[in-house]
């Protein structure tokens, strides 16, 4: 069973429904992709967007995140960049189920961590945090805590 998303042909292969592999198809050849597992908080690359969902008053509660934002978040493309190891954290507000569901298996197969800002399962959508490793994920959950309610 194979599912491909977008023109970039980012895919996930599900072998026996247990061994999941995320890959891209480049010139007809499959290339396995994975998150940047070596990312540290000091070297983190962050893509984020609040799309008018987070008021300026709330944004003032997360100054450290605002300082770390280096890339705009553009939905599936940003999540794809995380799965390929190009960025380490993606933060987005108010995702709908159809925004995030197709990406969850790709992110997980690439080794990423995904949850809502209040550390619930992302399957129900909402404000989403995706990270390349557990340490960074937990750090950003703490930073987002003032606005996660």
Protein language model regions, located:
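A short, compositionally biased
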Residues: 15-21, 108, 125
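An extended, acidic
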Residues: 34-149
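Short linear motifs in intrinsically disordered
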Residues: 10-17, 120
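Single conserved hydrophobic/aromatic residue that forms the stacking wall/gate
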Residues: 1-12
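Conserved beta-strand and immediately adjacent loop positions that scaffold enzyme active sites
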Residues: 6, 21, 128
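Short polybasic amphipathic segments
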Residues: 9, 20-26
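Predominantly a core beta-strand signature of beta-propeller blades
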Residues: 29-30
